[in-house]
Amino acid sequence: MDTIIKTQIIDLIHREVIPAIGCTEPIAVALAAAKAAEVLGRKPEKIEVYLSANILKNAMGVGIPGTGMVGLPIAIALGSIIGKSAYGLEVLKDLTSEGLKEGKEMVCKKCIGIDLKENVDKLYIEIISSAGNDRSRVIICHEHTHIIYVEKNGEVLTDLRTANASGEEVCENKDLRLSFSMVYEFAMEMPLDEIRFILETAELNKKAAQASMKGNYGHTVSKTVSGAFGRKFMGDSAYTHMLIMTSAACDARMDGAMIPVMSNSGSGNQGIAATLPVLSFAEDIQCSEEQLIRALMLSHLMVIYIKQSLGRLSALCGCVVAATGASCAITYLMGGNKARISYAIKNMIGNITGMICDGAKPSCAMKVSSGVSTAMLSALMAMEDKVVTSVEGIIDEDVDKSIANLTAIGSKGMEATDRLVLDIMTGKSC
């Protein structure tokens, strides 16, 4: 692998693996609101919000950090009042009790309008803020922090829109298309000092899990597994330790805890699921630091690779992708070679492909746990040279083609499913 490609991959990882506080979809909306307020130069009196279906779906039922509230209005209000766009996905980290009170007052004034925007990218956020005769407009598209358009009082300040900005574009980095072999080679052969930074994912996400265990968040999936019934019927093993640590961080995050996590490809839950099963297993088997670094890099880069063709948001639950990365890493830590790691990927795809995304919410911790369970099973089977074959379902002999089949189903094949899920969610009486 030449130096240019290595540098491109490192840059890609630094761009995709970043800290985030709160579910990334409502936080991205808060980021756009913060930028619109900054450009406006004053507190907005009216805010119009236009969102793609996937952003709307993922922001409806999830807790907003530090508020005890759920949904978009409070996220938009706080972004406009106390948000700082320079913080990116940590836009609300300066929240105070005074700021929260002011945000609640803005929500009560009903000056925030939220509407669905049709025929746009799956990740599309448009904010129009106004006060008096002043008006600002901000658009985020393709990526959670990618501000492509800024306007104030009719003057265009930034315009990165392209001819297909309102269409589907799932991979912004056209100069670097990853493959399984490229991911494996990079993770296994890079000098440790050049990839040691990936340990930051373990440090930050483990802190989130530890903080979660001190409280009661969401459906307390982690405490259920570690509780009396969990210990009695599931035991105490490397497997249950993985479930406990991973679901703990997700429990807290989905419930709106003011706890930062390291995200992957715009998703905190993907960052959690790519990190904590690997870290937990590594701690249980007492592997070396080098093994942990390479395992984490393999997991995170595999997630990035799959998301290149799947897209930021889809009808497919992101835990399928993230758990696939984790399964690769677990197989490696078990002593698996490249062939067995490819078996783990095929086993994952042959098992939980098709799990729908019905928005970000506390029960995501249960889906993450399902992904972790399948990751362990897939790794165990791979180590026994058991693999879903190319005569079965969507699996191809070529592992990259199998991944392409998975992402085609998630990005194209489930579009009608995505629309139906949103219709069901928005049509409920609750």
UniProtKB/Swiss-Prot annotation:
Pfam families: SDH_alpha
Domain of life from the UniProt record: Bacteria
Segments crossing the lipid bilayer: none
InterPro entries noted in UniProt: Ser_deHydtase-like_asu (IPR005130), UPF0597 (IPR021144)
One of the GO biological process terms: L-cysteine catabolic process to pyruvate
Secretion signal span: none
A single MF term (Gene Ontology): L-cysteine desulfhydrase activity
HAMAP family: UPF0597 (MF_01845)
Family: Belongs to the UPF0597 family.
Protein name: UPF0597 protein BDI_1130
Species, as recorded: Parabacteroides distasonis (strain ATCC 8503 / DSM 20701 / CIP 104284 / JCM 5825 / NCTC 11152)
